[in-house]
């Protein structure tokens, strides 16, 4: 029975690989990533209900919120954006899922650019531009008192990435367009960081902060060890590979 299940799982992975293509995101992908996440997270408990209670009146403001974050983190060299694409009926490539993996610990610090590298000027320039644009065009979908809910939740979880788990690939965000959910796209994205951690050796692990309802999904990707969690509204669990 186990051998049959393993064979079925292998076929599903092969089928997903044949239909979809996993690659590192390019600058030209950023708006597509934001659009996929906008559709995937619009009714999400945290990004939708808690952070953007007025999203039905101002749906595009949620898109711009997501795009601002993507732009800033894309130029943070500790982050790696990974996309899954497919081809539509006209042969054009379409982004159907995307993940933002970040490298924590010393390994993350080693990815930073030298201060003399001119590319270090891009991130602060983008932050300044977006801060100005946000003053002119505020996020009308948001509850301003809870706009930093997600950042605060991540900051409160820093205690998990210590000791043997200090060197880690953390799945910061992962979203798949609803039309492609349940087809292996999310698993491809989740397994990318798990495999990167394995390549680096036993001193590196992978992790994700997620809701209890997603435990089974991430468990299938190898994130099976629960280290901690948050109770209350928007609470979740921290899953690691070890």
Name each model-derived stretch:
Residues 76-101, 177-180:
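Conserved beta-hairpin
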Residues 21-35, 39, 44-47:
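A short beta-loop-alpha structural element at the N-terminal edge
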Residues 44-68:
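Conserved GNAT-fold acetyl-CoA-binding loop/helix
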Residues 176, 182-195:
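Conserved acetyl-CoA-binding loop-helix of GNAT-fold acetyltransferases
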Residues 61-83, 141-148, 166-170:
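A short helix-loop-beta-strand connector motif used in the catalytic cores of GNAT acetyltransferases and
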Residues 183, 187, 199-202, 212-234:
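Conserved active-site alpha-helix within GNAT-family acetyltransferase domains
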Residues 92, 100-175, 181:
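Conserved acyl-donor/pantetheine-binding loop and adjacent beta-alpha core of acyl/acetyltransferases
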Residues 167-169, 196-210:
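Conserved GNAT acetyl-CoA-binding A-motif
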């Amino acid at each position: 029975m186990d051998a049959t299940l393993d064979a079925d799982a292998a076929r599903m992975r092969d089928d997903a690989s044949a239909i979809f293509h996993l690659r590192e995101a390019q600058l030209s992908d950023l708006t597509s990533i934001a659009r996929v996440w906008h559709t995937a997270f619009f009714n999400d408990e945290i990004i939708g209900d808690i952070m953007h209670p007025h999203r039905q009146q101002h749906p595009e403001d949620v898109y711009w919120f997501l795009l601002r974050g993507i732009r800033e983190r894309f130029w943070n060299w500790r982050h790696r954006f990974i996309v899954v694409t497919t081809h539509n009926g006209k042969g054009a490539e379409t982004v159907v899922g995307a993940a933002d993996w970040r490298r924590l610990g010393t390994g993350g610090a080693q990815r930073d650019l030298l201060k003399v590298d001119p590319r270090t000027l891009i991130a602060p320039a983008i932050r300044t531009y977006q801060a100005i644009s946000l003053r002119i065009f505020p996020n009308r979908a948001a509850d301003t008192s809870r706009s930093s809910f997600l950042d605060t939740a991540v900051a409160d979880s820093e205690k998990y990435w210590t000791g043997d788990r200090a060197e880690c690939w953390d799945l910061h965000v992962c979203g798949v367009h609803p039309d492609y959910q349940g087809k292996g796209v999310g698993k491809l994205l989740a397994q990318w960081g798990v495999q990167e951690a394995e390549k680096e050796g036993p001193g590196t692990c992978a992790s994700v902060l997620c809701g209890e309802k997603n435990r089974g999904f991430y468990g299938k990707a190898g994130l099976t060890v629960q280290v901690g969690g948050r109770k209350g509204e928007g609470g979740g669990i921290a899953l690691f590979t070890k």
